[in-house]
């Protein structure tokens, strides 16, 4: 039992190391936009095309683009930024399946802990673009809205892409008219 307590206590150093590595890697990034979206959208998806084009537009305005670094929407946004000559940041996560870093990243970090990864998304972004996705996208979206609504971070644009996709959430939540302006 003492070994378990000791190993758990040492976990704090791994958490601290991930946080320091993220800050050191991104500290000179400059203004950026975080684009969130699902891993399962392929190149044939209109959402893939929209993410690619949106990221390219941001990069042409000298904004870096931060994504989850994986496939699907994350790849599309990274690719659009990379092809536009911008800085594409991938915040990858160790998962048992699905998540593999895409090839369109100028800066890449891999995290074990979701909460440290989310700190990096929030700390360096001036806006969030939320594309269709799954539980991870929903988690990132609600984290951002919660931090803004509780005034833990300054208010900034949170853009939902795909009104039809988000309609059910909007109806369930009933709060879009109350989102921080």
Can you say where each PLM-predicted feature lies in the sequence?
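Active-site/ligand-binding-proximal alpha/beta "capping" segment
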Residues: 112-164
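Short glycine-rich anion-binding loops that position phosphate/pyrophosphate groups of nucleotides
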Residues: 38-41, 94-96, 133-137
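Short amphipathic alpha-helical segments
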Residues: 78-79, 102, 140-143, 171-173
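Short, solvent-exposed amphipathic alpha-helical segments in soluble enzyme
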Residues: 82, 143-148, 174-178
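Amphipathic, Lys/Arg-enriched alpha-helical "gate/interface" segment within cytosolic domains
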Residues: 26, 32, 94-105, 115-118, ...
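Acidic/glycine-enriched connector segments
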Residues: 72-130
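Alpha-helical elements of the RecA-like P-loop NTPase motor core of helicases
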Residues: 75, 139, 167
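Glycine-rich beta-alpha loop segments
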Residues: 2-91
């Amino acid at each position: 039992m003492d070994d378990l307590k000791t190993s758990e206590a040492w976990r704090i150093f791994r958490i601290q190391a991930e946080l320091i590595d993220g800050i050191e890697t991104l500290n000179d990034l400059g203004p950026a936009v975080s684009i969130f979206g699902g891993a399962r959208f392929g190149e044939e998806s209109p959402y893939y095309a929209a993410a690619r084009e949106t990221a390219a537009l941001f990069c042409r305005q000298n904004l870096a683009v931060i994504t989850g670094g994986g496939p699907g929407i994350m790849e599309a946004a990274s690719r659009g930024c990379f092809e536009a000559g911008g800085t594409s940041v991938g915040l990858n996560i160790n998962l048992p399946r699905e998540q593999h870093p895409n090839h369109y990243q100028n800066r890449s970090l891999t995290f074990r802990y979701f909460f440290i990864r989310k700190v990096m998304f929030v700390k360096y972004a001036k806006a969030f673009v939320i594309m269709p996705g799954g539980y991870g996208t929903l988690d990132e979206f609600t984290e951002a809205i919660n931090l803004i609504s509780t005034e833990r971070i300054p208010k900034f644009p949170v853009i939902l892409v795909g009104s039809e996709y988000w309609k059910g959430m909007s109806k369930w939540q009933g709060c879009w008219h109350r989102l921080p302006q």
